[in-house]
């Protein structure tokens, strides 16, 4: 069984653990650098990206997670997507810069503007998982404003990319872990 880490300093890491189990993987809740040696891939969960950055620095994990991402698969959702982006606006903030995208934080509005939407994935996603719409939970979600060459869009919502991949990296601006559909997590497992 594949072991996948979920950064567990803040955010919805428990929901990702359950989604990984549904997809057939063993979650490892990463709180210490030594745990990075036990896993094949890492999920950066949703939560609050500035708080996660502070905790990564406080726990002295920022450089270790950045190093992990240089050679291993990483999947970021919502705040995790922000942490993976090369560029961050509204306001600008530090990130790992793993994926050639620029994101705008909280672009869908305030907490009260959060929503659940049906998203039709592109054939490239469906051909590698299963057909059908994705239930996308957007909670103060970022918008991907710019993508560079080499980034593949797997699903969009209202014309904006919401699920992308670049090589071993997967990014969702929504929360696939908050639904019973394990296809996005299964796609990440295929990268391990």
UniProtKB/Swiss-Prot annotation:
Annotated binding of L-glutamine, by residue: 47-49, 105, 139-140
GO BP term, example: pyridoxine metabolic process
Active site positions, chain numbering: 78, 175, 177
EC number: 4.3.3.6, 3.5.1.2
Domain of life of the organism encoding this protein: Bacteria
Cross-referenced SUPFAM superfamilies: Class I glutamine amidotransferase-like
Pathway: Cofactor biosynthesis; pyridoxal 5'-phosphate biosynthesis
GO molecular function, one term: glutaminase activity
Family statement: Belongs to the glutaminase PdxT/SNO family.
Annotated PANTHER family: PYRIDOXAL 5'-PHOSPHATE SYNTHASE SUBUNIT SNO (PTHR31559), PYRIDOXAL 5'-PHOSPHATE SYNTHASE SUBUNIT SNO1-RELATED (PTHR31559:SF0)
Name of the protein described by the UniProt record: Pyridoxal 5'-phosphate synthase subunit PdxT
Organism whose genome encodes this protein: Solibacter usitatus (strain Ellin6076)
